Amino acid sequence: MLKFSTTTTIEIKIAVSCDPALDMTPAEISAYLQGDFDSLKIKQDQAPTYFFIKPLSPADREEIEIKAGAYTRSELGRMIYLDQPDDQKTRAYWHDALSDQEKNAFAQYQSYLNRVYAETAKKALVRIEGFEGNAWDAIQSIKPDAHRILTIAEIVTHIQRISLLGDEGK
């Protein structure tokens, strides 16, 4: 039997791991990002910020990639990005050894990925519980910056999971 894309009319409620109202181990965070909503651990007498997201259709995802620059992104940068080491210290030395052309291509590709993340979040973020106004603008005002970046990354991770995995990913 064929599998069909998940409906884009549902809304999923998520929280992000950097929320101070949560108390989760790295293993619980990983499980939560993979769709195990039972791993969400909230501190007693606390309430996290909830974000409501919707799945994206294949057409939505293609539109996002094109808007972010899919046809003009650096293919050399993509190849270098895929080849980078996992270990942070090793990656630092590896990056330092790249030629200027390779560093530039790598930076261009990372910029493209950042645009994809931003466009994905803008398109699929429906609302933030208890917040009136533009949800994307609210995310841009999260401080410190590390929490803003992590919030966007986790929101996009959830969006990709529910958009690509169908019903079993929700």
Predicted regions and their residues:
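Short, intrinsically disordered N-terminal pre-domain segments
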Residues: 1-17
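Short, surface-exposed, charged amphipathic helix/loop patches that serve as local interaction elements
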Residues: 24-170
